[in-house]
Amino acid sequence: IGLGDYLDFASPSNRQRLRSAALYDAAEDTIADKALELVFDLFETALKPSVGRWLGLLEGHHFYQLKDGTTTDMRLCEMLKAPFLGSSVSGLLEFPNPRTNKGPGELWIWVHHGAGSGETLAAPLSKLDNLAKRWEGYDIFLMGHQSKKIGGSVDHVMPLRVGGQLHLIHKTRILACTGSFMRGYQEGRKDGLVPRGNYVEQKMLSPTQLGAPIIYIEPRWHRIFEDGKERREVWQPDLTIVQ
C-alpha cells in the first residue's frame, strides 16, 4: 500500500501559489510536463518491478494537479496498475479456512497518509495509538507523513461466550508509522552551484532510518473445546511487525 508523497513536488502551499500566479497556458503545460517527467523517472528508476503488486496508493500532501482533473498520484497508479485510494482507506483482507467452509478470516486495515509533526520518535506512534482507540474491529493501522519508521503491537482482550462458558480471546493489533526513502543529510548537496541542504537539514530536523516496516500475517483459528468436543473456531491471526 502506498501512503503518499511519492514526489517532493508540489506541497499544498506550492500548488496554491501556482494557482494564484495566473500563468499562461504554455507555462502551466511546461510545469505539468515536468511533474509527469518526475513521475516517469520514479517509475522507471524504482517502481517498475512492482507493477500489479499493489493493493492501492493513497494521496499524500505532495502532488501536482493536472488540467484534466487528475493528479500525478493518479498517473502513478495507472503506471503501477493499482487503484487510487484517496485520502484514507479501510481495507479488508480475507483468508480462507482450510478446515471448514464457514467463511474466511477477516483482517481489517486502516490506512491514512497522516498529518501533524513531532520531534520525538514516538510522536507519530502516539498519535496513531490515540486514534486507534476510536476504531473498533481493526487489526492493522498504518500512517505515513512524518517519515519515521516505528511500530509496535498491542493485545486487546475480548470476552466470548460459548454455550455456558466465558472465554477471553486475545487479538493482536499492529500500529505502524511507515517510514521514508528520502535521506535528510547528504554530504556535498548543492542547489545549482550553492552548497545547500535539503528541507530536513535546513529545518534542523532529526535524521530518520530509511525504508519501511514489514508486517507478517499468519492466518490462525483458535479452537475452543468443551467436554472434549470442539464447540467453536475463533479467527485469531498471528501478526508480527519487523522494522
Task: Annotate each PLM feature.
Residues 1-243:
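Extended recognition/assembly regions associated with phosphoester-bond processing machinery
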